[in-house]
Amino acid sequence: MGIKFLEVIKPFCAVLPEIQKPERKIQFREKVLWTAITLFIFLVCCQIPLFGIMSSDSADPFYWMRVILASNRGTLMELGISPIVTSGLIMQLLAGAKIIEVGDTPKDRALFNGAQKLFGMIITIGQSIVYVMTGMYGDPSEMGAGICLLIIIQLFVAGLIVLLLDELLQKGYGLGSGISLFIATNICETIVWKAFSPTTVNTGRGTEFEGAIIALFHLLATRTDKVRALREAFYRQNLPNLLNLIATVFVFAVVIYFQGFRVDLPIKSARYRGQYNTYPIKLFYTSNIPIILQSALVSNLYVISQMLSTRFSGNFLVNLLGTWSDTSTGGPARAYPVGGLCYFLSPPESFGSVLDDPIHAAIYIVFMLGSCAFFSKTWIEVSGSSAKDVAKQLKEQQMVMGGHRETSMVHELNRYIPTAAAFGGLCIGGLSVMADFLGAIGSGTGILLAVTIIYQYFEIFVKEQSEMGSMGALLF
């Protein structure tokens, strides 16, 4: 059934725009250039406003998810990476549940990736229609069918650009993946902005700067009571404070520390005697994939809940899914869940919120740990990183594990890889929860993603440099 499904969508995949694989080896300097161009296009799209919108000043229903999904409200990057990640989530769940079967052949892998891209484009259209029809840019009846269609086309073209930029990097023209690059850029930009933002906000305490560090110097300069000024800089509510900044740095350090945890399995060449090596199985075996997929799941749940709340306010089942409230305290207007399933799947705002509603905190912890472990375990089956796939790769390289025959390698790898995937997913979820409870800037999920992505790029740079043999190749 699975192969038939992939064969059915094959004609549709053939007409999709595609980036061709490079016919030659792309040099490191070229990869850096293409990565910079990709990032530049993304950042430009983040600043170009959508043409035709009447208003985007209403409460932002996806404020909490924008950092993670690399989206920017009212611009071409309104959807961010949400369509790509959502399509990946759907295809992974279908493959993990054996509803579709993905073989080991390059043909099946290519069809699977094509199906993911096709679903990504369909989801882009669907999300664009939902955003417009729910009144995010103004009343659709007042805007008219022409303007509504124009906004949908803009969002679709922008979504297609993101898909192709991601594919450009994944095909080997650049470094890493577009998804990772866009997420890390967005999160780091948010952290820097929250620390140094010169924007002023009117609060009950008077006019204050949004940036935590700028606010520290401003409070020390304007307050006569310096001790009180310091206390306010560390603990002020509804705006970034120094405690949030310290928590962010602490979480960065903890995640980098855990990145070094791994088990090295001894392997040796079956062809050449005396040639030994190790195969590392990291604690974060699936890296940040579990947290990305978990974010996609929650964001789509938010979209559905917001849409239903707008159309069927007061309905019991809709309220069971989620009830929402608007706030503009200490920043832009935003909507946040105050009841229903969406409330329990959203992180507590602070450690004080944990004490106020421990049931909410407990359900959130269980959801984060369980979903990250589940996505981590299922991801290895569809991404070519399971014990069977690794054993096949070692066999192709004519490498065997010390003290084991080729036939027993899969059994030995099965002792480590599924455990590393599940436990690594649990750790990722646990660290994300810890960062949320500490009040880290950019959310716990965002910090986890930023650190793991930056570490991935560090490893890519080290690998490229080792292949070139010297640091000199970094310079023109």
UniProtKB/Swiss-Prot annotation:
- CC terms in the record's Gene Ontology section: endoplasmic reticulum membrane
Q: Which residues lie on this side of the membrane: Lumenal?
A: 54-76, 139-144, 194-240, 310-354, 442-445
Matching entries from PROSITE patterns are given as: SECY_1, SECY_2
Q: Write out the GO biological process terms.
A: pronephric nephron development; protein targeting to ER; protein transport
Membrane-spanning intervals of the chain: 34-53, 77-96, 118-138, 145-165, 173-193, 241-261, 289-309, 355-375, 421-441, 446-462
**From which residue to which does the signal peptide run?**
none
Q: Which UniProt keywords apply?
A: Developmental protein, Endoplasmic reticulum, Membrane, Protein transport, Translocation, Transmembrane, Transmembrane helix, Transport
Q: How does it sit in the membrane?
A: Multi-pass membrane protein
InterPro entries to which the protein is assigned, alphabetical:
SecY/SEC61-alpha, SecY_CS, SecY_dom_sf, Translocon_Sec61/SecY_plug_dom
Spans within the Cytoplasmic topological domain? 2-33, 97-117, 166-172, 262-288, 376-420, 463-476
Places the protein is found:
Endoplasmic reticulum membrane
Primary subcellular site in the record, as a coarse category: endoplasmic reticulum
Q: Which NCBIfam families match?
A: 3a0501s007, PRK08568.1-5
Job description of the protein: Component of SEC61 channel-forming translocon complex that mediates transport of signal peptide-containing precursor polypeptides across the endoplasmic reticulum (ER). Forms a ribosome receptor and a gated pore in the ER membrane, both functions required for cotranslational translocation of nascent polypeptides. May cooperate with auxiliary protein SEC62, SEC63 and HSPA5/BiP to enable post-translational transport of small presecretory proteins.
Subunit structure, briefly?
Answer: The SEC61 channel-forming translocon complex consists of channel-forming core components SEC61A1, SEC61B and SEC61G and different auxiliary components such as SEC62 and SEC63. The SEC61 channel associates with the multi-pass translocon (MPT) complex.
Similarity remark: Belongs to the SecY/SEC61-alpha family.
Query: Could you tell me what this protein is called?
Result: Protein transport protein Sec61 subunit alpha isoform A
Species of the source: Oncorhynchus mykiss
